């Protein structure tokens, strides 16, 4: 007999974005690439090295496109209904929020403060939230800023919830004046809150330039005589919410932590900091879910926690199998759509397989999954199976895995069994928390190996992600509008190059460690297509080699007077391939509202970062594998725009927020990152000039218009370097780089013509 009542509406829905037309385009491009390879094979000449090199490069490009096609085949994401949450869930689960910072100079405390304030003010019961700030720089300035911010939070949080403010980072919210009647209650509250924020900002700025406050309070005694790489563990409760009823005026817990560091002890960078956050939060609040954000990624959507809970609390098999919920990363100071396009098309594509990769920020994790639980360890109702209970809950096993802290072991048992954690005084856990921050606490445990954030890579996020997927778990992707989190991009070419090198190096490290998808696709529970998706990401660095060669081949052939591309009717393969690919990628950008210029900048920077920054990642990994050197984690510099009231003019948020409208100019410095790009431009210019003056060698296979067009296309893609040769200051290429590149280019021309 059917029930009379209709089923309850879902908290979330999985949305498929399949497009048979886009699949056809992907397959067409793949077919053209295979046709080009077939032509190379049928017309190969053993004496023609260029032909063989071109074939090898194009084989790499074909394999990369095959991986892209696999990713984009079945895109999906989730639509959530947070307004249904209160009707469906009697009591919302607690959430621990983690913020990580490492350098008060490159990551100014005011940026950290704004991120923390935005987290404290989210639309979620304050008694269910706790914010933990990890300071790997052990900076008293960061701690001072947090103390002052916790005072301002008592004004900011009630203001946001009273008026349902969407953007809850003060520095961004106060950039525009409100449209409200003068003298109204809102207007008065707005003015008062803005004044208090300006006082907070001034205090932080004054403290940055002076240290008199350091000796004025006993609370800073722990920071005396400390260095960023040599100090004891510091754990301090900045603010404790003792109300515990979820009132709108309450402010969630705020805890400052800085783990012990010693010069002769490797600290595993951000992964080590995250694992200490997990342990301390497990002692104090032990929430079943954890959000982690970088210090510059503020909350841009107040319902962000509720949206994630819609995924976790949905009563379905998919939700029981979901290990983490990832939000896309977006930036308030960038008008270039590369990351947006990448996340929308490739991010959704991976989400349609086994789930998105963990991106290092803007991600909600399940605590017991981070404690090493596998999907096979769960019963149908999501609880531990009898075998898993014996495996995980034996005290001896837990001590060996998690360390010798009894309090930590007890919190792990509670988390694995999903027991509610009783409220307690946070300061009662301070002594144990400090012990767990010692350098030797993780020695002979599973932290960083099977538990928590995984080590052995500077990209701890993706390394941890593939470890989770290899245990059978899935993940979910939410693509909200407006973006859930916004951060700041590294400003200038050198900073971007450093970041790209770090990413590519870390990803390539994983390709050669035990988490490699080449191993996982055969002997772990990660799906085959998901392994291929990871392989696409991990091979970023390796792509630099064929791309570098392919940027030089047209110039070599023009100088050597040999053919690179097919002739006659077969040239149509190349023309059609390039034309379809350009139109396809241009459509992807314009479909999302980006301009043709944004598309060009992305295509240009794609070649620049691959041949310049990613190239050094290959060298880094080779030296590491040979034991000659170790990879180093370099913190990228964060900046924030000044807080100024707007004039009321109607501008988009990106236009208002972007602090550097001198964009479009590429910045250079004297580092080696810019040597390959300068060399490529000089070589292709020399080849074009040599063709015009008849410098080509005699008796070659005959280069032609196609090779000349190839050189022109390379110069267009590396146009920032061409402009940099005529600019001065930070926008100009240093003479030392130009002279080195010119010498290499001259050598290349001589060898090409001579051969």
Curated annotation (Swiss-Prot):
The active site is at residues 136, 461. GO terms for biological process: cell wall organization; cellulose biosynthetic process. Its EC number is 2.4.1.-. Keywords: Cell wall biogenesis/degradation, Glycosyltransferase, Golgi apparatus, Membrane, Transferase, Transmembrane, Transmembrane helix. The chain crosses the membrane at residues 24-44, 49-69, 533-556, 569-589, 615-635, 674-694, 702-722, 733-753. Disulfide bonds: none annotated. One of its GO terms (molecular function) is cellulose synthase (UDP-forming) activity. Pfam families: Cellulose_synt. The keyword Glycosyltransferase applies. It is found in: Golgi apparatus membrane. It is a multi-pass membrane protein. One of its GO terms (cellular component) is Golgi membrane. Signal peptide: none annotated. Thought to be a Golgi-localized beta-glycan synthase that polymerize the backbones of noncellulosic polysaccharides (hemicelluloses) of plant cell wall. This is Cellulose synthase-like protein B4. The gene is CSLB4.
